Amino acid sequence: MSTIRGTLSELSRAADAFAHEVDEAGYGDYTFLPDNSPFDLSFLTSKGLEARGSLIAAAEKILRLAKGPQGCLASFADTKGIEMGTIQALTQLEVPDKVPLQGSITYEELAGVIRVAPELLQRLVRLAALAGFLIEDESGAVRHTAMSAVFLRDTAAGDTARFLFDVDMRAYSFFADSLRLDPSGQNIGDGPTALAFQHDSDDQGNRPTIWDILERNPIQRARFHSTMQALGSFPSHLLKHILVAHDWHSIGSLVDVGGSLGHASLVIAENFPEIRITVQDLPDVVERGRSSLPTVPHAERVSFQAHDLFQEQAIIADAYFLRQILHDWPDGDAERIVRCLIPAMRPGAKLLIMDIVVPEPGAISPYMEKYLRTYDVSMFSMFSAKERTVQQLRDLVERCSARLQFQGISCPPGSATSLLSWVYSAE
């Protein structure tokens, strides 16, 4: 493992490479204030993304070494939890929505709107400010940082944060309870999210799953699909990665199964004019996607259809695309989803699965490995599911039909997700 000085050298090299790309993008005075900060880092090249990952990993190492073993452990149990709870509370009280994007608001004005004592509100904001969320101006009034301004600058990104604070975070303290009830981690009714929301159990005592929560709460359901949309602006999940992950020129018709609002399909259609795409999802989701279709020529080749993942596929197409779908389901349900596609598949049809692929320990950069493993555990937390290895995905698909022949895997540089492809062979 690196020493402090060795890690500092790593940090310096990565910071120089990262800063160079930030400068090239026109953000040389980047300080995390709204007026001089990029909204996202989608301008980074693959080298820039690599430098960013190395910079974050080195900075985290330095923090651990500087805190020491005892202090580092205490920060997980105390400091980080308090910071998260503070920003969660400010978000749920809609504080970021009440602070103007330009200018500031006094504590007295803000407290009057959200109905919290000014002195307590000030304490919360001042802690959040040290984490980069909100800040005080010279007069002591509250203004935005680039992070808190996200709620006003992008609805989908703001909805993502709200969904994670309202739903995801509640489950984190129920991991051990869930594992005691279900050591396999595959029974969603005993999962962390179900335990976190067990106060909403039905008359038979069945705890609500994440799917029950989304069905009963249209606000959270809309935020969930906004999260899928916003994910496309995260550096490791940029929609542009899809374009180089497969030879889309070889496909004339595509079914985007569970394609949410169609954000991925629209990008494919824009760049490959020969493809016609059907986006399938639940009725209210496809209605929202249909109503928000942009008025551009390529959108005419994208249509929406209500469809249940667990019902037999009726559309005959060249390819079926499952993008970040199977990781939401334990193995048995994931197999059912794949099996439902097979009746519509003809010889030569492709099955395309784009998901995080879990690597062997140490096989990729520390930053990306931590990112992927965090996603893996979050799938357990919310869905009692998981991210899978290449072999686990192959085994899952090939259990469904021996006629599905594995073609290969592609992971675009800087992408957190890989695209695996199968071809349906003749008997």
Curated annotation (Swiss-Prot):
Disulfide bonds: none annotated. This is O-methyltransferase FrzF. Transmembrane segments: none annotated. GO terms for biological process: methylation; secondary metabolite biosynthetic process. Homodimer. PANTHER family: O-METHYLTRANSFERASE ASQN-RELATED (PTHR43712:SF5), PUTATIVE (AFU_ORTHOLOGUE AFUA_4G14580)-RELATED (PTHR43712). InterPro entries: COMT-like, O_MeTrfase_dom, SAM-dependent_MTases_sf, WH-like_DNA-bd_sf, WH_DNA-bd_sf. The active site is at H327. Pathway: Secondary metabolite biosynthesis. It comes from Cladobotryum sp. It catalyses: (1S,4S)-4-[(4-hydroxyphenyl)methyl]-2,5-diazaspiro[bicyclo[3.2.1]octane-6,1'-cyclohexan]-4'-one + S-adenosyl-L-methionine = (1S,4S)-4-[(4-methoxyphenyl)methyl]-2,5-diazaspiro[bicyclo[3.2.1]octane-6,1'-cyclohexan]-4'-one + S-adenosyl-L-homocysteine + H(+); (1S,4S)-4-[(4-hydroxyphenyl)methyl]-2-methyl-2,5-diazaspiro[bicyclo[3.2.1]octane-6,1'-cyclohexan]-4'-one + S-adenosyl-L-methionine = (1S,4S)-4-[(4-methoxyphenyl)methyl]-2-methyl-2,5-diazaspiro[bicyclo[3.2.1]octane-6,1'-cyclohexan]-4'-one + S-adenosyl-L-homocysteine + H(+). Gene3D superfamilies: Vaccinia Virus protein VP39 (3.40.50.150), Winged helix-like DNA-binding domain superfamily/Winged helix DNA-binding domain (1.10.10.10). It comes from the Eukaryota.
